[in-house]
Amino acid sequence: MLTIESSLERRRFAIGDVHGCSRTLQKMVENVLQLKPDDTLYLLGDYIDRGPDSIGVLDYLLKLRESGFDIRPLRGNHEEMLLYAVADPTSRNMWYGNGGWGTLKQLGIDSPEAIPQRYIGFLNSLPYLIITEDYVFVHAGLDFQADNPLQDTPPQFMLWSRDRLVNPSNIGNRTLVTGHTVMPLFAIQGSLSTHHITLDNGCYDKGELSCGALVALNLDTRELLVQENIERQT
């Protein structure tokens, strides 16, 4: 059964893929957004892998939640790969090849089964989809070939799709907000006037032309907020 959240008188933000950039995320939340407990923050998945501090990202999200902040994190394909690697040893190589081995090294362990239950429980709790009155949040996309994309899109499509097709009339004229596919800042900015806003600028890939920043969106004003990658600054 789908749950549609009501928007109250509070600020609402969404943040794209973080990928292990814990210092950048913290600066975005505390200095750029200046997040307050009565704000709502949606996160689009892919908190782990590729960047230098995946566990720091998870710890920070858990700390925000435990401190009473209203955060609504989604599941990304990297979280799903980790969970599959824990449940099925034959799935490990796929995760390892997408940054998972580096995440294990950050934990100081060499097997997915040794990942602390604190993190496994958190990742298992993450939904694939969040629907509000005016937005639909999903990591990668929805299947607009389906009769009802909100009901009929398979989870793997939500996590892995790179299909740019969007038909807003099939999702209640809401705007779809996704991460997953790295886009240059000018393309992200251009998406703000459409029914499909993309927020992945490849935060982990510092130095890439027009990429390498963490991107957030004020959902009420459609203002784009950008924090450059600061992971390697001393």
Regions found by a protein language model. Give the residues of each.
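N-terminal active-site segment of His-dependent metallophosphoesterases
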Residues: 1-59
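A short acidic-Thr-Gly-centered motif at the start of a beta-strand
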Residues: 1-8, 33-34, 64-66, 128-131, ...
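Active-site-proximal beta-strand elements of phosphoester/diester hydrolases
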Residues: 12-19, 135-141, 197-199
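Divalent metal-coordination and catalytic microenvironments
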Residues: 17, 46, 61, 76-77, ...
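Active-site environment of divalent metal-dependent phosphoester hydrolases
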Residues: 19-23, 49-52, 79-83, 144-145, ...
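Active-site neighborhood of divalent metal-dependent phosphoester bond hydrolases
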Residues: 50-133, 158-166
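His/acidic metal-ligating clusters that form di-metal
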Residues: 115-186
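Conserved beta-sheet core of the metallophosphoesterase superfamily
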Residues: 154-228
